[in-house]
C-alpha cells in the first residue's frame, strides 16, 4: 500500500533535477584564443590556439566538460624561429605606427595550430608565415614538448593540420597566406617530413572565397575538410567531403550567422564525446577582446553531412546558439577557469603570462625580491619596442586590472606601469625625471604628467568596458582611486590579437628596476 506514495515522492524529487538541466552560455571563453582546435583523449579535452609573436608559444588548455577550461602548459618555451623574435631592431615603428618593417616580428610567429593524438603521443602542428610548417610532440599535453621540427621549410604557408588514415598513412593539409588554395601532402609515418610537393584539393575564389584554416577528419568512410570561408569578420563555416582523401570534394556551408548577432562564426575544430555527441568550437571576432571562443552542437544528418549550431528550417546549415544544454561528456560540470590574478609568490610565472616576443631572461626575476616581480628596464623609446613586456590574454566583457608598483629602484628616464597593450597602446605608470617620480598617463605615445608620487609605492588600475574602452586610475593610499584622464578606446586590431593587460618597464635614460607586488583581476558584473 506504500508503493504509490513512495513513487510520487520519487517523481517529485526527480522533477526539479530534470527542470534544472545544466546549460552553458556562449562564449565559453570570452578571451582571445583565436583559431582554436581541440581533441578528446579518454574523458579529457585539449585545446590549442594561435599565439603569434607572444612567448611562450601555443597555449594548451584542458577541460573535462568542454565548457570550463584552464591552461596546463605551452608547446614552445621560447619562439625559436629567428633573431627577430628577440626584437633586435633597428625599429621602424613607434606607439602611433602599427606596421613594423624590421627589427621585430609583430603578427609573425604561431598561426592556427592543430592538435592530434596518435600512437600514444600528442602532436601539435603550426605554421609561421615567413618560416614554414613545424610540429612538436609530447606524451603529456602539459609538457615537456619536443623541440620544434621543421616539416616544410618554405614561406607563405598557413594553418596546417595532420591526419593519420586507418592504414597508418600520414597526411598534412594546409593553406597559403592570403587565403589561397588548400594543399594536401603525404608525410612520413612519424609526421616529421613532407614526402612530396603536395596537390591542390580545394580552390574556388567565387564559391569558396578566403578559404583557410582546414581541419581534416574521417567518418563513415568519408573524408571531411572543415574550413572557414569569407573572411574573419563575417564568413561562415564550410565543410567539404570526398570518398578519396585526394578529392574531388563537394562543399557545403554548415554554419551561418543566420538571424543572430554572431558574425563570422567560423574556424575551429570538431570533437565527439564518448556518448557520440558532436561539438564544434570556433572563434568569433570581437575587436579589442580578440577572437573569442564559442561552442556549437554538431548534428550529423542521415546523408552524412553535418549541421553546426541550431538547424535552420529548410536549410542545410545551422546558426549559432546563445545557450544550450551542457555537453554529455560523462563528467560533471567543473568550476575550472582560465588563470588570471597572480601574487608572484611562486618561483615561476603563472601559465596565464606571456611576453611580447622572447624575453631577455637576465632582466626579470621572481627570486631577487621574493613575492615580487622585478623588471629591469632596457633601453627603448616606445612601449611597442620595449623588451620584457609581460602580458596575458584579456577576459571580457568587463574586466578590471590592478597592480602595486614599487618605484624605489627606478632610475632617471625610466618608465614602468600597467598597459592595455596592442596597436597604439595606452598606459598608466610612473616616470622618473629630474629626480622626481610622477604619475603619467600615456596614449599613442603622448604622455600626460600627473602628480608627484608621495611615497615609493602606488597602485595602478585599468577598467575595461564592454564597449571596449579603458579608464585608468591610481591610488597612493591603497584604498581611494583617482581617475586619470578620459576613457581611451582600445585598438580593435592588434597584429591579429586583441588588446592585453600587461606590466612593463623601459628606459630612455639610465637602467633601474621596477618591482610589482601583485596583479589582480576582477570580472565586474554589469
Where are each of the predicted segments found?
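Carbohydrate-active catalytic/glycan-binding domains of CAZyme proteins
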Residues: 19-526
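Bacterial N-terminal signal peptides
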Residues: 4-14
